[in-house]
From Swiss-Prot:
Species annotation: Thermobifida alba (Thermomonospora alba)
Family classification: Belongs to the AB hydrolase superfamily.
Enzyme class, UniProt record, top EC level: hydrolase
Pfam families noted in UniProt: PETase
Annotated protein name in UniProt: Cutinase est1
Entry's EC annotation: 3.1.1.74, 3.1.1.101
Annotated coiled-coil segments of the chain: none
Annotated gene: est1
Signal peptide: 1-35
Species classification: Bacteria, Bacillati, Actinomycetota, Actinomycetes, Streptosporangiales
Residue ranges crossing the lipid bilayer per the database entry: none
Length: 296
């Protein structure tokens, strides 16, 4: 027969209290970890997932007609079919371009858990600052005038912009005017203004080494250098690529654009691994140069 002495009883009680306290501490620690990032969407990322033509989310489309668009030329909205809330991104084409030149980016980014509008501009000759206003109008449209299927999926506190060429210049301009944006990605950007020292929005600039329309030496690099080092920023220069690299499917542009948006729009640190220290560079790489203000 087992007899519990007062001393043994006290020991068992102490042990039970310790176990209960440890369990409570584990629960207390686990809960914040699970709730630390309510914006995290999708599976753990891999390089092959980001290089693929589409991500883990199925995508639907909605047309924004030119007649119904206020302040821009209409476009196409791409959004995940899964009911949830997502960050929203507006993308502008470049000089003489239309939404068709950036449609691949819209669908690709949406498939990673974003609502994206690829816009047409009012005229294909619109200058960068006009494109900035139109990107802003497109964000407003998604929040107020799009269908409920789109509006109900957008987290209005998490907005970003992208653009090619003069659309990239417009992206820089809007980023300088709207510090509440979560991210900006100018693609082979063009703008007469070379100084963007007032930008605080996390900015990824993608240039191309063979660009003769917006040479990196007089556009992308000065733009990047002028943004304060206190701002989260990165410069990626494509290897053996021209000004029009963003107009066709490009796995490097797709991968690092998604990683940047995930990191700063979704605050998803799972994607930091792709940005810091960043891609391999050199003759055998798709990236000629990469620099940043890591760590992010």
């Amino acid at each position: 027969m087992s007899v519990t002495t007062p001393r043994r009883e006290a020991s068992l009680l102490s042990r039970a209290v310790a176990v209960a306290a440890a369990a409570a501490a584990t629960v207390a620690l686990a809960a914040p970890a699970q709730a630390a990032n309510p914006y995290e969407r999708g599976p753990n990322p891999t390089e092959s997932m980001l290089e693929a033509r589409s991500g883990p989310f199925s995508v639907s489309e909605e047309r924004a007609s030119r007649l119904g668009a206020d302040g821009f030329g209409g476009g196409t909205i791409y959004y995940p079919r899964e009911n949830n809330t997502y960050g929203a991104i507006a993308i502008s084409p470049g000089y003489t371009g239309t939404q068709s030149s950036i449609a691949w980016l819209g669908e690709r980014i949406a498939s990673h858990g974003f609502v994206v509008i690829a816009i047409d501009t009012n005229t294909t000759l619109d200058q960068p600052d006009s494109r900035a206003r139109q990107l802003n109008a497109a964000l407003d449209y998604m929040l107020t005038d799009a269908s409920s299927s789109v509006r109900n999926r957008i987290d209005a506190s998490r907005l970003a912009v992208m653009g090619h060429s003069m659309g990239g210049g417009g992206t820089l301009r809007l980023a300088s005017q709207r510090p509440d944006l979560k991210a900006a990605i100018p693609l082979t950007p063009w703008h007469l203004n070379k100084s963007w020292r007032d930008i605080t929005v996390p900015t990824l600039i993608i240039g191309a080494d063979l660009d003769t329309i917006a040479p990196v030496s007089s556009h992308s690099e000065p733009f990047y250098n002028s943004i304060p080092s206190s701002t989260d920023k990165a410069y990626l220069e494509l290897n053996n690529a021209t000004h029009f690299a963003p107009n066709i499917t490009n796995k490097t542009i797709g991968m690092y654009s998604v990683a940047w948006l995930k990191r700063f729009v979704d605050e998803d640190t799972r994607y930091t691994q792709f940005l810091c220290p960043g891609p391999r560079t050199g003759l055998l790489s798709d990236v000629d140069e990469y620099r940043s203000t890591c760590p992010f």
